[in-house]
């Protein structure tokens, strides 16, 4: 955690210094006032933390643990018509005792005109509604499984966890204002390396990702997204049955596996999305489809998934109730598959994972909230499909 502590100290020191509107120095009993430039005064320091308890009774993988889900520290600023952001993250994503610190956002965006904005650097990919949603605002124990696997988090291709981000350039804008000034159409399109955060392009080919949506009434948006590109080097595995003849000349099979690196692994994906968000009511659903091989070649070259959820106020600004249904099919099939050789050794793969979730979100203040959640999970890749999960989170912003 030394790296995280050092980075936090540096950012805190910067924030303290930039919030001073004047610097005064006394020399020879004379006081000199130095005006701080406007771009320096515009810099803001913020962040948030997510503390988690999670328990599950999954057979063979029971757990009951506290966890530091996420910590982020952010500098935002403005220089003329440009906004910029730098964000670092600390997380235990690798597991207890293995904290990681990494740069997740570093970009500048020209925002002079709402119809045409240009962003360059490292930032969220222009794919799906859920991807760019703040993890606390999102309101659940985690992003939907299909988002994690097909939107650049812990991607199907084996890409390192990138929080849905990549390095590139994006154009976006909002068009066609109505009589009230509310704009009815949004577009966004970006060109990216295709390798995730803090990584150069490994095959000199780029990912192109874009989306559009319409906003016919206040709070409602309906959209579609597309993604085509490659991952430069994809480490893959493949299990298969090899035939042979034994000493009695009887045909037998034995289970084998092979590791290989796929060059320029294709990613062709699309998504359909709908969302209504107004007066603390939030409803959202998305369907995602992927064509292209993943890091496990036994899964085939297709995957898909969807989710739908609702969050409604029980006590306005104080207590919300929520429910979510989600499904991810890692090989676009419902049931798992099994390879069994002549000696009875087997390899199981594929199948759908479905979750039914309910919970409550309680707001102590605007910047402090608790999330409670119960999930019933059906994972058909497991011998015992059904298990339960309980998740409690304390989330804060500053």
Question: What do these predicted ranges mean?
Answer:
Residues 51, 125, 198, 227, ...:
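Short, electropositive, low-hydrophobicity segments enriched in small/polar residues
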Residues 32-194, 202-209, 213-222, 309-313, ...:
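Outer membrane beta-barrel
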Residues 14-15, 82, 336:
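Hydrophobic alpha-helical membrane context
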Residues 199-205, 265-267:
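Interfacial loop-to-helix transition and helix-capping segments at the boundaries
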Residues 158, 199, 261:
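Charge-dense, low-complexity intrinsically disordered segments
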Residues 1-50:
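N-terminal periplasmic/intermembrane-space "pro-region" immediately following the signal or transit peptide
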Residues 190-198, 234-236, 240:
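Active-site-proximal beta-alpha loop/turn segments in soluble metabolic enzymes
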Residues 23, 58-60, 107, 111, ...:
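Outer-membrane beta-barrel pore domains
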